[in-house]
Structure formats: C-alpha cells, structure tokens
Amino acid sequence: VHFVASANTTEGTDFPLRDVNEQADSWLDATVDNSQHFSYLAQQFAMQLRAAHPNVPVGIIQTAWGGTPIRNHVKGGSIYANHIAPLEGFHVAGVLWYQGCNDSANEATALTYESQMTSLINQYRAVFDQNDLPFLYVQLARWPGYQYTQNVRFAQLSTLSNVGLHNASNVAMTVSLDTDKGTSTLIHPLGKDILGARMAAQYLAMSEGKAVPNGPLIAYAKHASDGTIILSFQKGTATGLQAEKPNYSKTASTTVPNYTANSDATPLDGIANVATPTSASLQGFEIADDSGKWA
C-alpha cells in the first residue's frame, strides 16, 4: 500500500504535496512510521483490498482537509481548484468520501448538502472520465455537537436516489450509526476499522459485478390502529435484521491480522464482537420526514 497526501493549502494550481511526500519525491509506503500522515479510514480500506487481492498494489491519493464545507470541494471551490482539477486525466479505481460535519453547523449549508453532494459525484466522475466510477461515502456519525447533523445525514441518504445523478450505479453509502463502539459523543469516534471493512466490501462487490452490500432502506411507513408506525423495507435490504447489544468495552484493534502469512485470516478479523446477539426485539427506528425533521 502506498499513498500521496495533499497539503492543506489553496495557493497555486499544482497539486500541493505534504512535506513528507515532497521530501521523499515519491509515493510513501503505508508503514507504521508513515501512518500518522495517512487517513486511518483509507488505511483500513486498503488493508481489506490487500486481504482480498494480496498481489495487487494499492495506491491512495489523499485530498482530505478536515473542517471544510462541501462547497469548497466542488467545481468553483478553492480546494477543488488545486486538489481535484490537477488530477484530470488520471485513471483512478474509485473515490472514498467522508465529510459533512462542517455543513451541519448551520441550516443553510445543511439544506443544500444533497444538491452539492450530487454535483460533486458527477464532477469527480467527469474529471476522471468514467461515468460509473465507484463512489463510496460514509453517512455522518451521530455526534450531537451540531444542530443540523440529522439534516446532512438525511441528505446523504437521499443522494442515493437523487435524479440529478448522471449515473446512479456504483454509488454506495456506508452507515456509521452503529460503528462508534460507544464513543458517539466524540466528533471523531472509534470504528474506522468497521467502516473501512464495509466500504471495501462494497467496492469489491462493484468490481466483481455482485450485489453491493448496504444497510436497511425503508420503502414506506403506515400508521397502525394502536398508534404505532409499521415500516416496510425495500426488498432485499433488511433480510436477517435483528437486535444486537453494543459492546461498549470494545476498543480499536492494536494489531492487524497478517493476511499474507495466514490464509485463514478474514477482513473482519480484529473487529469482531462489536455487538453481540440479544433476545430483545427491535423496538423502533429513527426516522425523518421529507423536510429532514426527525421523529
């Protein structure tokens, strides 16, 4: 696994390298020493791909810039201008996207997030000249610090079916609601290993022409006579749905399975027991109406 990471600057028109890449004048190996400069989510994603295809090298071009609104990442935005536009003509295998917290801070940006996200997917695919380029993104974690987080989360879900997408194939959202291992009060919760595994499973399914894994998707809801709401899910998206009890004592893995040496290792080794089965029945779901207001 190798990576190139961009510097957080909008000066100039050339792709701005971080000092570690600038000094090396090359791709950097994803070693322990270099990992501090490299997205942990991307590391976990790459690890899963290596597990599935140990003889295929993985290269990550990292353009992440924390605390920035999505408008800076689309055409006309300051980050797009020297982080994305210079990559036009490159061949890439896909895009990983985890952003939206900044846009959750005020109502105006939250309410325009879906249209911005839809444009971003179309534009990035155009840059790399592939209208079905795999685009994988994470739905925001449930951090309660910003008032409009739920609106952005709903916008991210709605993007999947937005009619403005030039091509809806190979677009997948990874749910993070159940992955934080009890750290939902942190703006950067645990669980990137789980997210990386889920995104890799989606990408591998896309590349192999198989059904892409996703979370349950509601088709419709109706009121029952007893005052409850009955939810119906889209066919095939809620098979085997069951209640589980979160393991709040589970911490991030300190070791990584050696997939090359151990053929029995699986991509989910090291992140098992995040939740355990329970005899409890499902009690309810968090739902929102078309305006993004949550019930």
Question: Model-found features: residue ranges?
Answer:
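Cell-envelope and extracellular/periplasmic
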Residues: V1-A295
